A protein has these predicted regions:
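Extracytoplasmic small-molecule ligand-binding "clamshell" domains
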Residues: 26-103
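Short loop->beta-strand "edge-of-pocket" segments that line small-molecule binding or catalytic clefts
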Residues: 37-43, 139-153
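Short helix-initiation/N-cap motifs at beta->coil->alpha
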Residues: 64, 80-90, 135, 154, ...
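Extended ligand-binding regions for polar small-molecule ligands
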Residues: 65-73, 147, 152-154, 218-257
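Acidic, polar ligand-binding/catalytic clefts
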Residues: 68, 72, 77-142, 208
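A ligand-binding cleft/hinge motif common to bilobed small-molecule-binding domains
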Residues: 87, 104-112, 159-162, 180, ...
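Periplasmic-binding protein-like
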Residues: 122-129, 193, 197-239, 257-264
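Ligand-binding clefts/hinges and TM-proximal coupling segments of bilobed small-molecule sensing domains
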Residues: 155-168, 207-210, 238-264
Length: 264
């Protein structure tokens, strides 16, 4: 009798322990973030103007400000964890941080293994021209027979070279081709819309944004699947930050335009 009773108690104990472990494992990420008091944010820290360190060693940038605003809406503080891009998705899946704020494109492939916030930036390839240039290039096709500056080895170089007839000039980076464009040695240049907005905002060169070319690329904040409460909290925070103008203010601070709205 005593042995049978002991077995029942042991079984009950094991069931209880298993249930407690399963419950703890199933705890929504929102509960963990609230209990901890911080939202752990993965980013590179070497990707201006989105995230990089200032001379004082503090992380600054568009994504840094966005992450801080989202964390504040959740009632916690942002805690940043820097990591190389090559390992950032793996770091998220391993639980090294709760979310990533590093211009992660929302793609069908990534959505198979991750959940995403609503998009908070929209980018595409974009032309840039001199301010005094009255020509209106609406597509890469319009640049046939013209000189187009791009950075060597980029997808923008490949995009430009895919259109026959464009005189593609390659450069080590944006500063070099922007100087040549301003000097009249190029008809236009091609780069990422967000990067060009940042460069033109912070440059004294007489340049202006041109037409968007190619499809729009939305970016969002990814996190691990299986956290419905956290997903709703993130979604609600993003909606509020868009509605109260916070996203627009942050965007204007870094780019001089609103990159948080879909490209028209």
């Amino acid at each position: 009798m005593k042995i049978a009773l002991l077995k029942k108690l042991l079984v009950a104990g094991l069931v209880g322990t298993s249930f407690a472990a399963a419950t703890a494992h199933a705890a929504d990420l929102l509960d963990q973030v609230k209990q901890r008091g911080t939202l752990r944010v993965g980013l590179e820290g070497t990707f201006p103007p989105f995230n990089s360190k200032n001379p004082q060693g503090d992380l600054v940038g568009f994504d840094v400000d966005i992450a801080k605003a989202v964390a504040a809406k959740l009632g916690v503080k942002a805690e940043f964890v820097t990591t190389e891009w090559s390992g950032i998705i793996a770091g998220l899946q391993a639980g090294k941080f709760d979310v990533i704020a590093n211009q992660v494109g929302i793609t069908d492939k990534r959505k198979e293994t991750l959940d995403f916030s609503p998009a908070y930036t929209y980018s595409s390839a974009q032309l840039i021209q001199r301010k005094d240039d009255t020509r209106d290039f609406k597509s890469l096709e319009d640049l046939k027979g013209k000189k187009l500056g791009v950075a060597l080895g980029t997808n923008y170089m490949d995009m430009a070279k895919s259109v026959p007839g464009i005189d593609v000039k390659t450069y080590p980076g944006a500063p070099e081709y922007l100087r040549d464009l301003a000097a009249g040695r190029l008809d236009a240049a091609l780069n990422d819309r967000l990067m060009l907005a940042y460069l033109t905002k912070n440059s004294q060169l007489p340049l202006r944004p041109g037409a968007n070319v190619g499809s729009a690329n939305p970016s969002g904040i990814p996190f691990k699947k299986g956290n419905p409460k956290f997903q709703k909290a993130i979604d609600d925070a993003m909606v509020q930050l868009e509605a109260d103008g916070t996203f627009t203010k942050i965007s204007d601070k870094w780019f001089g335009i609103d990159v948080t709205k879909p490209i028209k």
